């Protein structure tokens, strides 16, 4: 099956779009009429450019408001079509998309509509061209694929077929299952788009909020599976109208587009193998299976000598012990429970380059995987960029891929026997690593540019088969923050992704500090929040002070006794409870160098969230702390 994308899905000029589409690895392209109208070359020039780039022009679109027009306009519309046919022949494509009429005065008699399409198809047949008819979700008389198919069937022309678009069906809660019963040869083209699930006018939804497969909330595998079951083996194409995409970097967005199609094919293959195993799936993308990801092995910070010492002191106050020094590099290992933190101040290293670009920051995350080789091959299949660093004497090579911000994701196999990566690379000691009782990394929250959220979600979904939670919009004292978390299938790796379009929010300040994406905060799990925080206070950890009014509100919301509320307030512990009775206790440090901070948390009774209800008070408290405002001592 050929993979395609509509030029309207990308930013830039038509040549820039085509070059990006080819570089990403697409087979073909849909030429959107406005892109052609705004290009200063001829259709033949576009044809030559596509040929030079190895792209096939699979479709020209759209041809609007044709069938069911008032009878006095039919002849003029047919002449209009002839001019578009001229253009198509210059472009070298044989298929045009005709979308259902949206005019207020469009007629609705099925026999008349079918006859109009018949006349159009007969004219196209003279030139060896094909007509693909698509039902727009906001079409005046035709807005479902079933209605469109009825007209195509009635018109009964060999060169007239159906064009299917996932958005137009799923936005109306349509049922695509019946597509499996259509003759596959009468489906001429399939367009795919995802979208967040919104309650709004369908036209506005389509024009502004479509996104690539895997970035929204539609069941696209459930849509594509019956298409494949019908016998269709034609192009799969992306048609995405999105305000953010119109400003996104053209080449990076094209790469995202191809990755999203591959991801959709994989998920459709899995769907078919579960539901209808007799359907052939050989033409659908089949990468190596995702390797089980069951935790974070270590987090690596890029620092220099001075900031490395300062961060090391911070972490030691949080209960981390210096557990080792690298055998040949200026790299330290700090440990507490199953948490391993690496401070890398080695000159002329990857970390040094990252530090020069971003300052003190998280430059690498090591994921625990069952099969590192398989995980790396899957990442390659999805367009991930492998990384190989310079190895010192007797140093173990760890496979890695670059994340979207240029940081590294190491792929570590956790062995129960033999020498660990730390034994190979570090001179370790017998330091007590029990610390405050912190046990593991609970989650790592990232601050991203506003246009980057969908790309990061797709990256983790495709390369690592992570799931994604729904978006949550949270108030900051200076604007709004949007958060969406991705997580490994077993839930042991959680990555809340945060964006803000407002200039003065905490997320925006992080982006300014890092000169790009960066870690927002790191959360550590513990078994006893009050014992851990008591030790942290005693060690001099700068904990974020929470306004006392917050605890008055807790008293109104929950049936807590005064003694327990006083304990929460004394230790600055925030509290949340979910609908199932799960509980979260968490406390935050003040930021390190006004960049990232740490969270200590305890989950009880299956609580799986991140304390969204407490984000506003935490952000307000941080704003107060920046201004030097301290609460009255208890």
From Swiss-Prot:
Keywords: Cobalt, Lyase, Magnesium, Manganese, Metal-binding, Nickel. It holds the Pfam family AP_endonuc_2. This is 3-dehydroshikimate dehydratase. Homodimer. CDD domains: HPPD_N_like (cd08342). Residues 295-414, 440-590 form the VOC domain. It catalyses: 3-dehydroshikimate = 3,4-dihydroxybenzoate + H2O.
């Amino acid at each position: 099956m050929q993979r395609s994308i509509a030029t309207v899905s990308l930013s830039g000029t038509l040549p820039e779009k085509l070059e990006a589409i080819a570089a990403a690895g697409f087979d073909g392209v849909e030429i959107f009429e406005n892109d052609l109208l705004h290009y200063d070359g001829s259709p033949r020039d576009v044809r030559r450019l596509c040929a030079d780039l190895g792209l096939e022009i699979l479709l020209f679109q759209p041809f609007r408001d044709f069938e069911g027009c008032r009878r006095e306009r039919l002849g003029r519309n047919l002449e209009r079509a002839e001019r578009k046919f001229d253009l198509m022949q210059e472009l070298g494509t044989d298929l045009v998309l005709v979308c259902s009429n949206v005019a207020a005065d469009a007629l609705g008699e099925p026999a008349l509509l079918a006859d109009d399409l018949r006349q159009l198809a007969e004219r196209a047949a003279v030139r060896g061209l094909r007509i693909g008819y698509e039902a727009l979700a906001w079409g005046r008389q035709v807005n479902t694929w079933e209605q469109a198919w009825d007209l195509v069937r009635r018109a009964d022309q060999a060169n007239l077929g159906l064009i299917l678009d996932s958005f137009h069906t799923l936005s109306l809660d349509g049922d695509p299952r019946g597509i499996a019963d259509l003759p596959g040869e009468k489906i001429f083209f399939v367009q795919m788009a995802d979208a967040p699930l919104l309650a709004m006018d369908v036209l506005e939804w389509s024009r502004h909020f479509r996104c690539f497969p895997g970035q929204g909330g539609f069941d696209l595998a459930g849509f594509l599976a019956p298409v494949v079951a019908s016998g269709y083996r034609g192009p799969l194409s992306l048609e995405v109208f999105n305000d953010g995409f119109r400003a996104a970097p053209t080449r990076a967005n094209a790469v995202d587009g191809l990755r999203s199609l591959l991801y959709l094919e994989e998920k459709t293959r899995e769907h078919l193998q579960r539901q209808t195993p007799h359907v052939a799936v050989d033409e659908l993308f089949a990468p190596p299976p995702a390797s089980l990801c069951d935790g974070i092995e270590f987090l690596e910070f890029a620092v220099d000598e001075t900031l490395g010492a300062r961060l090391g002191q911070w972490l030691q106050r949080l209960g981390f012990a210096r557990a080792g020094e690298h055998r040949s590099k200026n790299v330290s290992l700090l440990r507490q429970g199953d948490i391993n933190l690496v401070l890398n101040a080695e000159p002329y290293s990857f970390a040094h380059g990252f530090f020069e670009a971003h300052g003190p920051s998280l430059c690498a995350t090591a994921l625990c995987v069952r099969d590192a080789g398989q995980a790396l091959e899957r990442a390659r299949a999805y367009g991930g960029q492998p990384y190989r660093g310079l190895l010192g004497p007797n140093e173990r090579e760890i496979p890695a891929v670059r994340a979207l911000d240029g940081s590294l994701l190491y792929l570590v196999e956790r062995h129960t026997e033999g020498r660990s990566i730390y034994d190979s690379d570090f001179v370790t000691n017998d330091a007590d690593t029990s610390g405050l009782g912190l046990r593991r990394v609970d989650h790592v929250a990232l601050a991203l540019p506003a246009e980057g959220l969908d790309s990061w979600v797709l990256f983790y979904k495709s390369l690592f088969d992570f799931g994604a939670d729904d978006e949550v919009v949270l108030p900051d004292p200076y604007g709004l923050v949007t958060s969406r978390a991705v997580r490994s299938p077993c839930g042991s790796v959680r990555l809340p992704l945060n964006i803000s379009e407002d200039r003065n929010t905490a997320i925006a300040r992080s982006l300014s500090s890092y000169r790009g994406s960066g870690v927002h905060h790191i959360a550590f799990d513990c078994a006893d929040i009050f014992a851990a925080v008591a030790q942290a206070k005693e060690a001099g950890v700068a904990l974020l002070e929470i306004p006392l009014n917050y605890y008055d509100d807790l008293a109104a919301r929950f049936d807590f006794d005064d003694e327990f509320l006083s304990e929460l307030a004394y230790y600055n512990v925030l509290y949340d409870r979910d609908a199932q009775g799960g509980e979260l206790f968490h406390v935050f440090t003040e930021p390190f160098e006004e960049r990232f901070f740490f969270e200590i948390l305890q989950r009880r009774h299956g609580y799986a969230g991140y304390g969204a209800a407490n984000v506003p008070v935490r952000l307000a408290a941080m704003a107060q702390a920046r201004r030097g405002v301290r609460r009255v001592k208890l």
